[in-house]
From Swiss-Prot:
A single BP term in Gene Ontology: proteolysis
Listed name of the protein: Kallikrein 1-related peptidase b21
Annotated InterPro entries: Peptidase_S1_PA, Peptidase_S1_PA_chymotrypsin, Peptidase_S1A, Trypsin_dom, TRYPSIN_HIS, TRYPSIN_SER
Assigned keywords, A-Z: Disulfide bond, Glycoprotein, Hydrolase, Protease, Serine protease, Signal, Zymogen
Activity regulation text: Inhibited by protease inhibitors diisopropylfluorophosphate, leupeptin, antipain, benzamidine, phenylmethylsulfonyl fluoride and soybean trypsin inhibitor.
Inducing stimuli: By T protein.
Amino acid sequence: MRFLILFLALSLGEIDAAPPVQSRIVGGFNCEKNSQPWHVAVFRYNKYICGGVLLNPNWVLTAAHCYGNQYNVWLGKNKLFQHESSAQHRLVSKSFPHPDYNMSLMNDHTPHPEDDYSNDLMLLRLSKPADITDAVKPIDLPTEEPKLGSTCLASGWGSITPTKWQIPNDLQCGFIKPLPNENCAKAYIHKVTDVMLCAGEMGGGKDTCAGDSGGPLICDGVLQGITSWGSIPCAKPNAPAIYTKLIKFTSWIKDTMAKNP
């Protein structure tokens, strides 16, 4: 499970690490400037850890396996390591990981077939609302299931090489396809459930990877998933990645935001 594993390694080192899962864009390209205005860079202290998605001026959605403390976020960034006048910095006042995510999987351990990374999402409440500009815009939650055959765009600042941690300066984009969950179930020892979305290229070469966790998967212009986990190395043939299937969580997301204005 590449995304989580790499995340753990990052967390324990200069960024922080998680379980056998990880995420980044391999085989992608530099996103057009301000083309992903909902994309958020999530930091712990001054270390980049994950991507995120701006749902409204007060709330960011990311992955539960990015859980920690002392979060802060950057919005409106195209280049992670450069000053940009379009960028906005915000502190996070409170985090809300999904209550059914198994946090014990955050501990490094030997993978088991019963490991279940379902419910991998977390809401971050910003301490100050984001200013909506051309570079910073929210994206709506989905209202229907993603369709097989649609075109999906993943974005992130995750590693751009499959086996070595190489984080890019430019936000990366990559086109992939939603696939039947059976394709992912055949590829992994861990459980693949109906609240997960399988996506990628069966031939390999394009994939999210370590550092992309929590970032958006947008299919035919609709936010359908956030990057959760996959294989190491990334972009292997017959090993597409897993995304949290957001249509399954719209009620929890809306209820959590409404109860914490």
